[in-house]
């Protein structure tokens, strides 16, 4: 009888575990508009992560499917950044440091994002840190967001950080 009870408890544990894992793996990036991120940053400063994309860009769609859907990437972005999706081909108006401009002007003139996808990193006060053009798989992006999200860029070179960073997005 004791053996049967132990077997049932163990079975319930195995059955319950996947549910915990699957719910933990479903975190999605909380995307904001640029102006929403600016307003939030005034109350609680965090760096900005900006995904500059277009609707026709195949690699942008791959980043949505493979990189931004990764639960560790999404959780880290949600905790350490204000994440923004910016389509430069939309005529939406945004306010960069109080000046109204279109998405396209902001992406090209301020963020130097002229190819897609490009990820752009800003300080909480909208100071440009770095645009990074091209597709980034989950592990590549995970390394970069740790470098910026934990302010390693202020004290450590990218090469030194990259050599010692061993975490993965898997």
For the regions a protein language model found, what residue spans apply to each?
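Non-catalytic, surface beta->alpha helical segment in thiol-disulfide oxidoreductase systems
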Residues: 109-154
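Solvent-exposed loop/turn segments at secondary-structure junctions
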Residues: 54-59, 67, 88-92, 126-127
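Bacterial Sec-dependent N-terminal signal peptides
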Residues: 1-23
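Structural alpha/beta surface segment adjacent to cysteine/selenocysteine redox centers
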Residues: 80, 86-114
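A short beta-strand-turn-helix
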Residues: 30-47, 77
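Flexible coil segments in periplasmic/lumen-exposed cytochrome c-class electron-transfer proteins
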Residues: 152-170
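Short active-site neighborhood of thiol/selenol oxidoreductases, capturing the structured segment around
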Residues: 43-58, 83
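Typically the conserved alpha-helix immediately C-terminal to a functionally engaged Cys/Sec
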Residues: 60-78
């Amino acid at each position: 009888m004791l053996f049967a009870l132990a077997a049932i408890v163990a079975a319930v544990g195995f059955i319950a575990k996947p549910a915990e894992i699957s719910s933990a793996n479903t975190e999605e990036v909380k995307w904001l508009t640029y102006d929403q991120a600016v307003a939030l940053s005034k109350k609680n400063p965090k760096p900005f992560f900006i995904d500059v994309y277009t609707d026709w860009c195949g690699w942008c769609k791959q980043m949505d499917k493979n990189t931004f859907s990764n639960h560790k990437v999404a959780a880290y972005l949600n905790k350490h950044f204000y994440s923004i999706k910016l389509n430069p081909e939309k005529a939406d108006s945004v306010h960069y440091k109080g000046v109204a401009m279109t998405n396209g002007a902001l992406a090209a003139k301020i963020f130097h994002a002229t190819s897609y996808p490009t990820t752009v990193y800003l300080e909480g006060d909208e100071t440009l840190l770095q645009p990074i053009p091209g597709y980034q798989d989950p592990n590549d992006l995970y390394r970069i967001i740790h470098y910026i999200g934990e302010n390693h860029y202020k004290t450590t070179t990218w090469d030194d950080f990259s050599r010692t960073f061993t975490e993965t997005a898997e």
